[in-house]
Design a protein with these regions (language model features):
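Short, basic/hydrophobic alpha-helical segments
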Residues: 91-113
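RNase H-like polynucleotidyl transferase catalytic core
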Residues: 41-52, 134-164, 177-178
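Short catalytic/ligand-binding loop motif for oxyanion handling, primarily in non-cytosolic enzymes
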Residues: 25-28, 121-125, 158-161
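Acidic/histidine-rich, metal-coordinating catalytic segments
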Residues: 20, 108-123, 152, 160
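C-terminal anion-handling pockets and recognition modules
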Residues: 13-14, 146, 155, 159-208
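Mobile genetic element proteins and their domesticated derivatives, centered on retroelements
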Residues: 20, 63, 97, 117, ...
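Extended, low-complexity cationic-aromatic segments
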Residues: 1-99
Length: 208
């Protein structure tokens, strides 16, 4: 399916996107390496949480890495991000899928090959039902973007090419000797990935 969707004649209407979620910590320091002077070495200063801090210690984020070009030389230089007030759950997943479909429709796409892992908020009944009903609506109305989910093998997150993007991103947005607010961190992440910073998706009550 991936090879078929990557063919030039399909690229006009098909989108290929690898979806994943990640937590961005305001306090945890990533493992990083850099060239530095022996006279003035660079140190990362670990910050401590304070009770008066109104922001969350970490931000949950949904992301899609879009792929175009042939499968033997894929181009993966575009990302879509959306932060969450809370944690990834099925309700937020469907919201993010809807946002992505709206964006793809504006680009003239009619189908999305969605590649992701087997997280509970991906395989839940709520999400499977939403995708099925969404596709029926697209077929009935003749408008919108169909979603074709393709699951990665279980316990193989490294097969998702978005994973290295997260790792490098965490190294690049770190504040060496200070503490960013949640909004500052989110804005810095969006700037790094060349994405616009949008309002956070909100988790509704009593959903999972």
């Amino acid at each position: 399916m991936l090879t078929w969707a990557s063919q030039e004649r399909q690229a006009q209407t098909w989108a290929i996107g690898f979806l994943d979620e990640v937590w961005w910590s305001r306090f945890a320091l990533p493992r990083a390496h850099t060239w530095q002077s022996t006279d003035d070495p660079l140190h990362l200063v670990e910050q401590a949480w304070q009770k008066a801090d109104p922001d969350a210690k970490a931000l949950a984020c949904y992301g899609v890495l879009w792929q175009r070009g042939p499968t033997d030389a894929p181009i993966r230089d575009q990302m879509s991000l959306r932060f969450v007030d809370g944690r990834p759950v099925s309700d937020i997943t469907t919201q993010f899928l809807d946002v992505c479909c709206t964006t793809l429709q504006a680009q003239g796409k009619t189908a999305w090959l969605l590649i992701w892992d087997n997280a509970s908020w991906h395989v839940s009944k709520r999400v499977r039902t939403w995708i099925r009903e969404h596709n029926v609506q697209v077929k009935t109305s003749g408008k919108g973007v169909r979603i074709l989910p393709l699951f990665l093998p279980k316990q193989s997150p490294w097969l998702n090419p978005i994973e290295p993007k997260w790792i490098h991103g965490k190294r690049c947005v770190i504040e060496p000797n200070g503490l960013l607010t949640a909004k500052q961190l989110a804005q810095r992440i969006c700037a790094y990935f060349h994405c616009s910073y949008e309002a956070h998706l909100t988790i509704q009550e009593n959903v999972s």
